[in-house]
């Protein structure tokens, strides 16, 4: 417990008091390169705490993070069915057909190119299944 006490009571205050924080706005322009380097670690710590708080308390950030990490593929199509299955007879296909694998299409089960936007959002590389006759 003594090392933590020393850190909080002595080391951290000494470090913070030695930082080259100017008294005026004009003082920021007079800082040397070495002074700017000394300000990087506390700036990174404050930015990290801010980003962590943003992820923890901002509803928009929670929605984005949970959508990327949920593991669910189908968020839209025929959610009332336990399993989505489409049977298509190969004889009904003219020359070729592209079928969706990303579950983002509005023309299910055919691909409408929605995987392009899906790939940008998630970093995925999914494309359609192309069936040729």
Curated annotation (Swiss-Prot):
One of its GO terms (biological process) is regulation of autophagy. [2Fe-2S] cluster binds at residues 100, 102, 111, 115. Its cofactor is [2Fe-2S] cluster. It comes from the Eukaryota. This is CDGSH iron-sulfur domain-containing protein 2 homolog. It is found in: Endoplasmic reticulum membrane. GO terms for molecular function: 2 iron, 2 sulfur cluster binding; metal ion binding. SMART domains: ZnF_CDGSH.
């Amino acid at each position: 417990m003594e090392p933590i006490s020393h850190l909080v009571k002595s080391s951290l205050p000494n470090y913070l008091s030695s930082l080259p924080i100017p008294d005026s706005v004009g003082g920021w322009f007079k800082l040397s390169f070495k002074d700017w380097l000394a300000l990087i670690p506390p700036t990174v710590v404050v930015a990290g705490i801010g980003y962590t708080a943003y992820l923890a308390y901002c509803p928009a950030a929670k929605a984005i993070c949970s959508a990327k990490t949920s593991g669910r593929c189908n968020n839209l199509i025929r959610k009332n069915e336990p399993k989505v299955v489409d049977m298509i007879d190969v004889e009904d296909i003219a020359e070729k057909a592209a079928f969706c694998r990303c579950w983002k299409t509005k023309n299910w089960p055919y691909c409408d190119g929605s995987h392009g936007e899906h790939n940008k959002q998630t970093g995925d590389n999914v494309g359609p299944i192309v069936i040729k006759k």
